[in-house]
Amino acid sequence: MKTKHWYDYLWIWTIVYFALGFFNILFAWLGMIDFLVPLFIALFGGSKAFCNRYCGRGQLLAKCGKCSRNEKAPGFFASKWFRYGFLAFFLSMFGIMVFQTYLVAAGAADLREAIKLLWMFRVPWGWTYTAGTAADWVAQYAFGFYSIMLTSTIIGLVVNTLFKPRAWCSFCPMGTMTQMICKLKAGEKL
């Protein structure tokens, strides 16, 4: 039997993160851990250890593998053009979210208290934030970041169901960024 390590339970973190954000959107800021830690590990460790060992979302997808059809994922999922294109798309969405946060911070836009799936479909969770709890820009960032995290997790679960477990990992934007960092550190061509 395989020895269990503390990091084998990080899938629970993904569930806790979404549960906390469901009740108070300001907890969405905790998702920055999942955004920054893989980059730091790649920058300072030169490896994809986060993806391979510590990614709670990847572990959750593996746990949900029993719901998978176990079909081979399309080869283009792992192709450079798809991975880099998907990364560019997600970074664009992240940039728009940061810009919206800036507009709210500068007083040029009002707080949009909305969680959106796929950046289009508003989720009717009106109880996630009480106005005045934090600065409007802090809440705006939380709404946007939670939307991105929820959208990417739902995409991952759909892909996981249609194909093999962790098929999402083949084109995950964080995985693509950490792979790029590792290749650059090793002097390899992107």
Where do the PLM segments sit?
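Non-ligating segments of multi-cofactor redox enzymes
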Residues: 1-190
